[in-house]
């Protein structure tokens, strides 16, 4: 067997130190962003003026607006967006807080009742000769870790939103000095969010494990069963963040586009459009706060899944701390690798032209993957015993440390492949999107047909990538292999999030430039940043969906072993009915979220039309629109509409587990995983392709694009219709599906002891 080279003390120092370095790096990047001043006060001395960058660039007065006014205007708009986003999140968190308390009580009652709230120790499920802590302890600690995960998730989302709204106007102002400066500001702000989230998630989990260990001592099984609540808390908050934020952002977006662009023929982000502030707020609450919570949830769950599966392995039974915390050590090294990778974008290379933006972001993915592969090899060598035993459904499996390294590496590279395939299908630099744009010649119908076909086709390679990584990792290390493969895919989360958050920040920067009446040249620069951000956002969604599939499977494995099922037989009717119902759930969920966006957008369209018709001088630009009403419509609609889809996901495992038992529930989990992944990938890519086909026609960068006509042509109108249909697909139902897949699995895992003892009431009666 042989113990790990890295001593336990080394592990206990390494993990928190890496987390603290991550947080320090995030604060340092934030400090650099904050050096861009949003006040228009000039220093008297010429040296100070040079230092503040006033002499770096010529102030463009093409629009007759002097520098002072532009800065003040940008600050005002930024303030409005920040206030809108903060008020939405506080309203959302009020409702989510009530849910958290109610669900925490439920966890305590269900898990406590497993042994009738007894406080005496019980025989362990994996080894009857040993005694484990009572179920009541698991109930209390699971409840605490659920609340911890939930709060960490909410804080992550909120901080991300604050950073994004802090950086958007600064990116706009930097765009006056050139595209390179604006890129660095947007990217640094994204990095602040990425590192804060990754380091926070790791640190809180590590502290929780150490505090719980004081009580649990050597009972790893009980300890990590209780820690699973952390993943459940993180993901259930992410569900409301993603669904609520997604409905908010798309209701505003669709409403603003339909009335502004299609009916009134005014440009995007025109300050005369009443829904324009709501649209920009939506970018922050959906694409930043929602996405941050989502990836944090995946991160927490993949760690929990790996720890639960490992707790009944040989190093779990021999109490080897370093080997046990291998998943956390991988994440710690991930933070250091991402730190190095970020410096490539901000310090080692400079962006001088528009065409260098997208390659720079893609390089981030490649560099982080290559460096991480080396990092994981080192970690596997020092933190694992040369060989160890994993118990898989009652069967022992001997695993070598190099095999576990391959499991992590396979997940890591599968993530990169999924990212690049997504980019190929959604970037307008390649033929798939250009074909979709070309199909607009014959109207919106052919555009929709081509877009749907593209989405379905884009599922093929990612599914093979996921399938191969599952096969390889399962062959080498059973369910533990799959859990660490998911962790491998998420190990470069800090870089992934930085790239992801960069998109909405640039999008907002463009909106602010338009509203502040800045020159055409600046708008072109922010548009170029935004177009690259659009593709990288699609790559980010690919990562989130791919990792969700692996995480869900790992959680499924942990659930099956916790619920003491030895085999899941598809031929038994109990399992098969679960399978069919599970496969239907993603469709039901998508129907709810799509309809919610539609009905919220209807209200928005009516309000925007009402303002254009009743406010005199609005179209001429002499009167100000009532932005606040539109923000309120989006807020109210999204809060009301996020409850039914949320209830569907949270209640399904409970209802199925209690009424039909663990076998049917295992069928439901497998079914939802299989169909959910396919719909999520195709929905995200279809929406992304329609969006970029529209941008391709608008930019008119190539001969082919120019032949499809300028803005306002029939081709362009057909493209706008496709884009509007794709909005809820790519930003609401697609990305929320990966939470459905993971959340049902992690919830089943948390409640597994209860379902195993009290579940299947219907089958007991009949």
UniProtKB/Swiss-Prot annotation:
Keywords: Disulfide bond, Hydrogen ion transport, Ion transport, Magnesium, Membrane, Metal-binding, Translocase, Transmembrane, Transmembrane helix, Transport, Vacuole. It comes from the Eukaryota. Mg(2+) 3 binds at residues 283, 507. Inhibited by excess pyrophosphate as well as excess Mg(2+). Inhibition by ATP, GTP, and CTP is reversed by increasing the Mg(2+) concentration. This suggests that the substrate is a particular metal complex such as MgPPi(2-). Modification of Asp-283 with DCCD abolishes pyrophosphatase activity. Substrate binds at residues 250, 730. It is found in: Vacuole membrane. Mg(2+) 1 binds at residues 253, 257. Mg(2+) 2 binds at residues 253, 727. The chain crosses the membrane at residues 9-35, 85-114, 136-163, 187-216, 220-248, 287-312, 321-346, 355-382, 402-425, 448-472, 479-505, 535-563, 574-602, 632-660, 662-689, 733-758. Belongs to the H(+)-translocating pyrophosphatase (TC 3.A.10) family. K(+)-stimulated subfamily. Homodimer. This is Pyrophosphate-energized vacuolar membrane proton pump.
């Amino acid at each position: 067997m042989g113990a790990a080279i890295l001593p336990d003390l080394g592990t206990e120092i390494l993990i928190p130190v890496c987390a603290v370095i991550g947080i320090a790096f995030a604060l340092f990047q934030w400090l650099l962003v904050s050096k861009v001043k949003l006040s228009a006060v000039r220093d008297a001395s010429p040296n100070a003026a040079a230092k503040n960058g006033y002499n770096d660039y010529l102030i463009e007065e093409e629009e007759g607006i002097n520098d002072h006014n532009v800065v003040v205007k940008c600050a005002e708009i930024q303030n409005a967006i920040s206030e809108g986003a903060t008020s939405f999140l506080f309203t959302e968190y009020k409702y989510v807080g009530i849910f958290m308390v109610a669900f925490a009580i439920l966890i305590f009652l269900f898990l406590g009742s497993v042994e009738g709230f007894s406080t005496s120790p019980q025989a362990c499920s994996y080894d009857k000769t040993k005694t484990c802590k009572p179920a009541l302890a698991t109930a209390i600690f699971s409840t605490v870790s659920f609340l911890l995960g939930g709060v960490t998730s909410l804080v992550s989302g909120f901080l991300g939103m604050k950073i994004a709204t802090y950086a958007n106007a600064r990116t706009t102002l930097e765009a006056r000095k050139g595209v390179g400066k604006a890129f660095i500001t947007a990217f640094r702000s994204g990095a602040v969010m990425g590192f804060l989230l990754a380091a926070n998630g790791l640190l809180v989990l590590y502290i929780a494990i150490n505090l719980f260990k004081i009580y649990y001592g050597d009972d790893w099984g009980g300890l990590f069963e209780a820690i699973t609540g952390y993943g459940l808390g993180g993901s259930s908050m992410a569900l409301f963040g993603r669904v609520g934020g997604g409905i908010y952002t798309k209701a505003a977006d669709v409403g603003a586009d339909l009335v502004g662009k299609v009916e009134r023929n005014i440009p995007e982000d025109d300050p005369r459009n009443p829904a324009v502030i709501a649209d920009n707020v939506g970018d922050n609450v959906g694409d930043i706060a929602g996405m941050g919570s989502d990836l944090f949830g995946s991160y927490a769950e993949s760690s929990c899944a790996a720890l639960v599966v490992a707790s009944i392995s040989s190093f779990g039974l021999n109490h080897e701390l370093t080997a046990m915390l291998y998943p956390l050590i991988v994440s710690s090294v991930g933070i250091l690798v991402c730190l190095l990778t970020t410096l490539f974008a901000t310090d080692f290379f400079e962006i001088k032209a528009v065409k260098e933006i997208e390659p720079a972001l893609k390089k981030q993915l490649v560099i982080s993957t290559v460096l991480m592969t080396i990092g994981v090899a080192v970690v596997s060598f020092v933190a694992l015993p040369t060989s160890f035993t994993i118990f898989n459904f009652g069967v022992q499996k001997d695993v070598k440390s190099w095999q576990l390294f391959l499991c992590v590496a396979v997940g890591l590279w599968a993530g990169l492949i999924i990212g690049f395939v997504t980019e190929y299908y959604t970037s307008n630099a390649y033929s798939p999107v250009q074909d979709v744009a070309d199909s607009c010649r014959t109207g919106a119908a052919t555009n929709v047909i081509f877009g749907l076909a593209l989405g379905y086709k884009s599922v093929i390679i990612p599914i093979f990538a996921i399938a191969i990584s599952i096969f390889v990792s399962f062959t080498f290390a059973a369910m533990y292999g799959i859990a660490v493969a998911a962790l491998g895919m998420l190990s470069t989360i800090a870089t992934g999030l930085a790239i992801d958050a960069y998109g909405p920040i640039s999008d907002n920067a463009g909106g602010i430039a338009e509203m502040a009446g800045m020159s055409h040249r600046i708008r072109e620069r922010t548009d170029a940043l935004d177009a690259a951000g659009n593709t990288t956002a699609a790559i980010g969604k690919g990562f989130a969906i791919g990792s969700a599939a692996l995480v869900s499977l790992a959680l499924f494995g942990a659930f099956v072993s916790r619920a003491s099922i030895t085999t899941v037989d598809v031929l038994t009717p109990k399992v098969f009915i679960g399978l069919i119902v599970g496969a239907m759930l993603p469709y039901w969920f998508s129907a709810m979220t799509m309809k919610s966006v539609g009905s919220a957008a209807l209200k928005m369209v009516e309000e925007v039309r009402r303002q254009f018709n009743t406010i005199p001088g609005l179209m001429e630009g002499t009167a100000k629109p009532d932005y606040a009403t539109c923000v309120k419509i989006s807020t109210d609609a999204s809060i009301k509409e996020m409850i039914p889809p949320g209830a569907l996901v949270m209640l399904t495992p409970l209802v199925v587990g209690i009424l039909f038992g663990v076998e049917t529930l295992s069928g439901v989990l497998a079914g939802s995983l299989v169909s959910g992944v396919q719909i999520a990938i195709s929905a995200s890519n279809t929406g992304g392709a329609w969006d970029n086909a529209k941008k391709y026609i608008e930019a008119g960068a190539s001969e082919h694009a120019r032949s499809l006509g300028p803005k306002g042509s029939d081709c362009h109108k057909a493209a706008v219709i496709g884009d509007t249909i794709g909005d809820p697909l790519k930003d609401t139902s697609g990305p929320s599906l990966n939470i459905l897949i993971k959340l049902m699995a992690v919830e089943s895992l948390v409640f597994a002891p209860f379902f195993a003892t009290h579940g299947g009431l219907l089958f007991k009666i009949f």
